[in-house]
């Protein structure tokens, strides 16, 4: 299966937040199981001018992956209960990332349901902490390259047209006025609509 390469991810963060919509994220667990989901919601974070970004005040041990090669994962543990998965963007040395907020389940549904303790497909991946739990993404994936065989984005054309909306990001307290959330407007799998949207 062909994968998207580093050149795809070496783009401005806001552009990539939109280009990732409709793409298929894959996690091969190594024990014969595979999770696949279509990305339907993202948020952009940039060190420059964005106080909500982990790298706003510079590099730390925690945010170091954000300064690495584009097309790697930045996974962190939030509020002691959720892993959140970001895809690093921009050239190496420039901190930027796209948070994956929601996906539409494609493959591995029964394992996702077991991991989440849920039966409703629409609720499995409709939030950044939900999707990592369902797809078994943990801190062990922090810094992982999307050019490998464990986690990657499929190189495929998304033939289904979709309308993209923008809105304020969810669950932050700084730089709240930025319309840096992107989502597929007619998807049932997004984490929630938001005031101030622009479609």
Curated annotation (Swiss-Prot):
Entry EC no(s)? 3.2.2.-
The top EC class, named as a word, is: hydrolase
**GO biological process assignments:** base-excision repair
Q: Where does the secretion signal sit in this chain?
A: none
Q: Which UniProt keywords apply?
A: DNA damage, DNA repair, Hydrolase
Molecular-function GO term, any one: DNA binding
What family does this belong to?
Belongs to the DNA glycosylase MPG family.
Protein name according to UniProt = Putative 3-methyladenine DNA glycosylase
Species of origin: Chlorobium phaeobacteroides (strain BS1)
């Amino acid at each position: 299966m062909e994968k998207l390469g580093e050149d795809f991810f070496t783009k401005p963060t806001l552009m990539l937040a939109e280009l990732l919509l409709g793409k298929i994220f894959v996690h091969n667990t190594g024990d014969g199981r595979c999770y696949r989901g279509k990305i339907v919601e993202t948020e952009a974070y940039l060190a420059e001018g964005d106080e909500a970004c982990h790298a706003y005040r510079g590099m730390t041990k925690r945010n170091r992956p954000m300064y690495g090669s584009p097309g790697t994962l930045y996974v962190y543990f939030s509020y002691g209960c959720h892993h959140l998965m970001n895809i690093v963007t921009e050239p190496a040395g420039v901190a930027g990332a796209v948070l994956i907020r929601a996906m539409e389940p494609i493959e591995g549904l029964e394992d996702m349901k077991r991991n989440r303790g849920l039966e409703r497909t629409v609720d499995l991946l409709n939030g950044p902490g939900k999707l990592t739990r369902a797809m078994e993404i943990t801190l062990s994936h922090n810094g992982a390259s999307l050019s490998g065989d464990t986690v990657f984005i499929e190189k495929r054309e998304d033939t289904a047209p979709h309308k993209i909306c923008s809105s304020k990001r969810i669950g932050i307290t700084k730089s709240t006025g930025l319309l840096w959330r992107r989502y597929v407007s007619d998807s049932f799998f997004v984490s929630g609509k938001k005031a101030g949207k622009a479609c």
